[in-house]
Amino acid sequence: QNKVRGNLIRLGGFAADFVDRIMEPIVGMAEPFRYRNKAQFPIGTDRDGQPIAGFYAARTHSIIPVEDCLLGVGENKVILDAILEYMRAEHISAYDETTGKGLIRHVLIRYGFTSKELMAALVINGTRLPHQEALIQRLTQIPGMKSISVNCNRENTNVILGEETICIWGTPYITDDIHLCDCSDDRFIQ
């Protein structure tokens, strides 16, 4: 709380007496895990050429495989496992930033805490997803799945999403009780 107060005064330029008058006590989270409603995972390959999902190592583009991030919902792991299994079974390649080759670049997942609806979006380096019915069959087995999309990003860029998103199953959005806003893959909601 003192750090926030100090930053408001030092960085924000607010008068100390003003901050002291309006600032309320900071309340911690009752449960500091599994609270994120959106996750995005880069897709790459391990040393054996097998597809992996994870996070970038600090200040690099090297992917550290992550089986489960405790900030995201448990369904993230189930969805990633299904996508990686699909990639292995159908011989779908992961994107390689160095060569610009390979198909699957990222996976974005959204979860509606009130609606219990799930959205999965695959960002691809192409215009179509081979054997997409096999992927749909896997993902629709997951309770709550409402939306499966493919986003096309063929640019050599570190921007995750491309211009075009195609809903390949379900609806192009999920709904949650955030003032009943439709949540698509490119919207920021927290």
Can you name each region flagged by the protein language model?
Residues 1-190:
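Accessory RNA-recognition modules of RNA-modification enzymes
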